[in-house]
From Swiss-Prot:
Belongs to the UPF0178 family. Transmembrane segments: none annotated. PANTHER family: UPF0178 PROTEIN YAII. This is UPF0178 protein YPO3033/y1450/YP_2656. Pfam families: DUF188.
Amino acid sequence: MQIWVDADACPNVIKEVLFRAADRTGMMVTLVANQPLKTPPSKFIRTVQVASGFDVADNEIVQRVEKNDLVITADIPLAAEVIEKGGIALNPRGERYTPDTIRERLNMRDFMDTMRASGIQTGGPNTLNQRDRQQFANELDKWLQQARNQAK
């Protein structure tokens, strides 16, 4: 098991949480992005740079993810594909997607796309706050504990 990060849009503060967790637990963290990334030196952190283009990083993650791997992404369609392959999807705010919640989120995303296409201003998500970071860290710790238990 390992952690995959949709790194182009992942907040730096969340990457830092992941870097600390990788070194603390020995869990491999792979950041996938279409641009070069700076990471701390660690044998548990690696980067994969893909070509620029729509969904290229997402497709790379979907190809590589395995059952029970954790994927960090705010991209709803990517999260849906990860779940379909048996992976776990967690967004940077600490929301762990399930088969039920991902369907609901896909429907809401499609609805919002339709509204934006008709000219309605929908706004974006709120700024990541301390509570979000704590929720993310808590969910990450839960997954890491499950991974340790399965490895025994």
